[in-house]
């Protein structure tokens, strides 16, 4: 696991994990998964030493580019969606945004057992109700207290935050609303959110209909 230092209070600087992932993929190296500040690499029994050296070499090249504060467009010329700014400026803006939105504290809350959502029904029952037409579209901002009919998770990292049959909580809703804002600020880094749909540019989710009759 690679931990980017911008997530740690004792370090003032770091490189966004999504940017590192994009850079490595441009070099033919695909991480297993990543989030804001961590990247997971899997080593297999048959891997050669050269594979690890290739990864370390690519990371060293990116570190050098960071130290030289090179333009992001120069580091990843094939990615036109990235902003026109130097890598230190982008990294600083990225971590400032995360800390300003207090996202690390929110994530700790989401994965604390006392904050897990209630499940008024099983996932199987939720799926049956959805297939039988007992669901309705709900604007994301109005989802608190409603029962979701499908799993909702950002990918990467691919960790389910809300399973079918569970209830949207204030904290879970806050996180997905944060992701919407994050996507507007850093569109190139926005993860795919399974279970979140768009209609006329506005996010909505499928929930149990208030009128099931």
Tell me the role of every PLM-derived stretch.
Residues 1-213:
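Non-catalytic terminal extensions of PLP-dependent enzymes
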